[in-house]
C-alpha cells in the first residue's frame, strides 16, 4: 500500500488554494507541511479525550508520506502526532524516515512548525541507526531545518545502534 503515492522533489510545487506559500521552504517541505496541515482538526472526542491539536507528516526514505494527529487524554495515555504517524508507517511495513514536519497553530491561530517533544525524539532515534539524519522543519518563516541528532545530542543509545549496524 502506498498511502499517498510516490513523492519526490521533482514534483511541481504549486501555491496552495489558501494562498500560503513559503518560498523559503524546499518543495519537499512545502508538500509535507501541506499534508500535515490538512490533517489538523482539533476536536473533542469525549469529555476525557481531545484530538488533532498537532498533526505530523513524515516522508520515508522510499518516498511515502504518513500522517498522524495527537491524542490528548485525561490520563498519561495520550499519544503525540509524530508517534501516530510513525505507527502508520510501521503498519505499512516501513521504518526509515527522511523528513518530518510537525504542524500546529500559535495562540493567534497562525500556522507554525513545532519541534518533536523529548519522548518523540527518543522514539525517532530508536527506529534506525541513521535516524540522527532525519531532517525536521524547525522554522516555518525561514524554512530552517535541523537534523534529529541536533535535538538529541550525545544520545545514550548511539553505541547500541552502531554495534547492531556492523
What does each model-found stretch correspond to?
Residues 50-60:
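Short beta-strand scaffold segments in enzyme catalytic cores
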Residues 81-102:
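Short, solvent-exposed cationic patches
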Residues 64-65:
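Hydrophobic "anchor" residues
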Residues 26-46, 95-166:
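C-terminal binding/interaction regions
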Residues 6-10:
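Intrinsic-disorder-associated, low-complexity terminal segments enriched in Asp/Asn/His/Tyr and depleted
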Residues 53, 69-76, 83-84:
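Conserved mixed alpha/beta catalytic, RNA-binding, or beta-rich assembly cores of soluble enzyme
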Amino acid at each position: 500500500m502506498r498511502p499517498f503515492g510516490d513523492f519526490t522533489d521533482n514534483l511541481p510545487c504549486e501555491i496552495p488554494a489558501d494562498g500560503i506559500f513559503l518560498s523559503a521552504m524546499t518543495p519537499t517541505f512545502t508538500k509535507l507541511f501541506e499534508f500535515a496541515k490538512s490533517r489538523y482538526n482539533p476536536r473533542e472526542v469525549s469529555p476525557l479525550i481531545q484530538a488533532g491539536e498537532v498533526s505530523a507528516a513524515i516522508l520515508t526514505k522510499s518516498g511515502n508520506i504518513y500522517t498522524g494527529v495527537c491524542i490528548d487524554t485525561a490520563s498519561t495515555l495520550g499519544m503525540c502526532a509524530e508517534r501516530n504517524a510513525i505507527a502508520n508507517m510501521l503498519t505499512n511495513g516501513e521504518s526509515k524516515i527522511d523528513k518530518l514536519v510537525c504542524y500546529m497553530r500559535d495562540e493567534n491561530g497562525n500556522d507554525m512548525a513545532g519541534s518533536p517533544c523529548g519522548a518523540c525524539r527518543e522514539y525517532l532515534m530508536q527506529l534506525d541507526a541513521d535516524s540522527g539524519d532525519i531532517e525536521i522543519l524547525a522554522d516555518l518563516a525561514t524554512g530552517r531545518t535541523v537534523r534529529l541528532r541536533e535535538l538529541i545530542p550525545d544520545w545514550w543509545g548511539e553505541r547500541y545502534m552502531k554495534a547492531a549496524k556492523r
